[in-house]
């Protein structure tokens, strides 16, 4: 799978309103809607609840390819769940397997990864399977067909757009669920802190006459483990005048940084306690804006970096 993302142009079809989307979705794919709605209504708890895979929607990239966005729902409010790749966590067709997370933060997390398919495979379903410790299997198909699921890159009512994210050069920036992958694999040792950094810029254009926008809408960056051996990481800060610590609402397992100027580099120190191959994810969003929310599938971007940890 090619994990190198690039900024996409706008889709050709306007975004549907939520109510209309639900009606169309019920007509177009009742089984998918019923399953995901049932999962949303399932009991929540502090621990020992399942994780459900979610199909968020699809993008027409305008170049003959389609990007399918996936997220998940961890019904635990305070417990991170880890499900390694394998029989309990896999994607079919197998060529797309490995893109999905193994580390599941609490609650609803939308658009954590995406896969891109060509036009001649548009009729295929991309299935994501998760199985809990009791052997219960949960699966969802990603498909780039139903108009009710089509997503877009148009500015929201007050101008919000997904922030750009990059590791080396802004010319290589990505955005949205597909985001961007770092070319280089970082290396460190168990117990030795390593700096993780990602740059971002919010390109939203908002009305300066609106009092809500007299000050910049900050970009929030959430660093978390995405894949890797079981176990938690320890986070610290290298110290940077361009970023602020925020408490956020991401729950355990994540480190949250605010960039008050809506651009800059978000840095954290990560210490790994087990050797192995890891992927770290940085989510950049502007959700403090009045028209930006994950529930509207806007406006955030993903950035991923591989880390190899030796003993």
Regions found by a protein language model. Give the residues of each.
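Sec/Tat signal peptide C-region and signal peptidase I cleavage site
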Residues: 31-35
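Short proline/glycine- and polar residue-rich coil/turn motifs
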Residues: 102-108, 259-262
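Acidic, low-complexity intrinsically disordered segments
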Residues: 122-132
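Bacterial N-terminal signal peptides
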Residues: 19-30
């Amino acid at each position: 799978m090619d994990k190198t993302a690039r900024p996409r142009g706008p889709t050709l079809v306007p975004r549907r309103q939520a109510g209309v989307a639900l009606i169309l979705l019920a007509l177009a794919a009742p089984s998918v809607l019923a399953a995901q709605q049932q999962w949303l209504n399932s009991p929540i708890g502090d621990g020992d609840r399942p994780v459900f895979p979610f199909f968020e929607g699809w993008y027409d990239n305008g170049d003959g390819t389609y990007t399918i966005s996936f997220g998940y729902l961890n019904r635990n409010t305070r417990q991170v769940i880890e499900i390694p790749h394998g029989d309990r966590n896999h994607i079919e067709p197998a060529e797309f397997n490995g893109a999905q997370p193994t580390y599941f933060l609490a609650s609803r997390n939308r658009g954590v990864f995406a896969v891109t398919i060509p036009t001649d495979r548009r009729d295929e379903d991309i299935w994501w399977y998760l199985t809990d410790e009791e052997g219960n299997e949960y699966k969802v198909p990603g498909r780039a067909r139903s108009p009710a699921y089509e997503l877009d890159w148009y500015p929201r009512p007050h101008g919000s757009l997904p922030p750009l994210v990059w590791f080396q050069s802004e010319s290589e920036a990505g955005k949205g669920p597909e985001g961007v992958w770092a070319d280089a694999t970082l290396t460190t040792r168990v117990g030795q802190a390593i700096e993780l950094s990602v740059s971002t810029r919010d390109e939203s254009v908002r009305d300066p006459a609106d009092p809500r926008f007299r000050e910049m809408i900050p970009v929030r960056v959430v660093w978390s483990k995405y894949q890797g051996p079981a176990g938690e990481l320890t986070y610290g800060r290298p110290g940077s005048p361009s970023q602020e610590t925020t408490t956020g609402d991401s729950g355990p397992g994540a480190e949250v940084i605010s960039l008050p100027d809506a651009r800059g580099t978000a840095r954290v120190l990560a210490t790994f306690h087990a050797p192995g191959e890891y992927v770290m994810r940085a989510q950049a969003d502007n959700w403090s804006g009045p028209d930006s929310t994950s529930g509207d599938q806007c406006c955030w971007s993903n950035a991923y970096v591989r880390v190899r940890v030796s003993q």
